[in-house]
Amino acid sequence: MVRAPEPELIEKMRTTPLAGLASSLGIDIDAWLPIASSPLPVTMRLTPRRHDIDWTREQLIAMGGKRIEWLSTIEAWQMPFPKGDIPDDAKAMLMILHETGRITRQEAVSMLPPVVLEPAKDSLVMDTCAAPGSKATQLAEAIPDGLVLANEPSSGRLNMLATNRGRLGLANMLIMQHDGRHIGRMPEPGIEGIVVDAPCTGTATTRKNRDLWWGWSPKDGRSMFQLQTDIAYRAAQLLVPGGLMVYSTCSIDPTENEAAVCEILRRCPWLELVNIDANRLFPGLVVHHGIDNWEILDEEANPIEWTGEIPRLPGLKEEMLNPLIRGEEAPPLSYTIRVHPHDNNTGGFYVALFRHIPEATPEGIAKSMILKRKLMREPVELPRQNPNRHTINPADSELVKTICDKWGIDASAFSWWHRGKRTNIASPMTLSRLYHPTVQNNKGDFWPGDAFHPLRIVHVGQPSFTDNKGFWRPRGEAMELLRPHITKNLVDVDETTLIDMLKGNVPLVEDFPVEIETGSSILRCGEHLAPVWVAARVSFMVSEKERDVLRLKLGVEVGGEEE
């Protein structure tokens, strides 16, 4: 059910420049306004391949959740309540499911770009503007045998990205920190798939940001144009021939959408637009094709008649005008898609799909890796970078052996990384595609292999083990990732023992019903696994929210009493 604002407020919104922008696009304002000004429904992505995914589905159904049918290639759900009006019991349950990595709260339209990209399951892909991480983690879930480079320039937002990676236990994600316009050089041949979810004015996000109604004017979209196209240009330089790149925004402004696409094609003649098959990818979703005849708007969003001269408006440049005005043949902008809130009870979104034309680059590598001038001498090995606090190194073989012997893990299933008291596990592709190869600079010299430089990699894979007084214990958030691989130090207990501990009892070792070694172990009760630390007592080493999941599954009230 959609709860629209009072009629008086809607009438005020009708007079805003934002409504003028929508009207200039041919949007039915009477149908659009009540939805575009109402709260969004709560939506989420269900984490695939978890052992208890059926249990999670049961919780969503019990709250009145329903599958989003038009997202047919992933499992997404919509709740029967809006974001600002979640019942208390549902709010508590959603928090438990989200924080333990069973769901990811995410707008439905935000899930479009990774689906449009359709990455191969063993490919190397990149998200250029990844925080807070909903699309990057969706990509990682889509390519379990591949690798995601998640880039974020802001340190604060990068921490959110790392939190979401850790919450979901993803070993196939690397987090790096670059200005998206200047992402570092990397090994040949480049990247197979890229998502550029560009920074934008968010004019399609009015359902969660009401300030836009009163704060937006056309100059805001123009102010984003250069940044958006610069980020996309750098991404296109890193794309392998035949590779795909998605450009997307949560804006309805053609300056940030179709005009940006035209500029990307002008600057990147090796790219072509690909027709997005929305009927196949999103069956039942109402979409609109991209346009090629957008109008010039003044600061009140009133259309300005073209007189042959560019109007003197804040930030307006020739490349922001539609191709018909510029006297140019328009690219097939109808290949791109727009989603409007009132058609599907969603937010709004714009998506374009590009392909690196293989014939445009017979060298078979990304454009940034082709020397502008042939090197007339032997290439020189460049000096290694000095290590710093962010430097991540492969774990020592003895350390890996210690962990794998303790827990019965096949070391070859992962690449192993060490920093401080943590050991991370990552996709083996991390070594073969990014760490071992040499990297050429723009002069033809090269940095030696066995380093990530010049990429500024901040986090590799999933933190999975912590050194605790000489014992390498598994981290609670990594348990789902480790579950299929751990074969030793699993201590079987009955439900009574587990329930007793979930009620708050921390038993002495001598009172524990089964023999258990000092240090780190994992309690197993049927399908339930719980890491513990054993000293004088046996103590849980999992988060309180994960304990709440165990309580719910075993019939123990989250408050501590048995149901």
Give names to the regions the model predicted:
Residues N151-P189, V196:
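S-adenosyl-L-methionine
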Residues M1-M63, W306, L316-N322, G327-P331, ...:
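Polybasic, low-complexity RNA-engagement segments
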Residues D145-L149:
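Short beta-strand element of Class I
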Residues I143, G156, P189-R234, L239, ...:
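Mobile active-site "lid"/loop adjacent to the S-adenosyl-L-methionine
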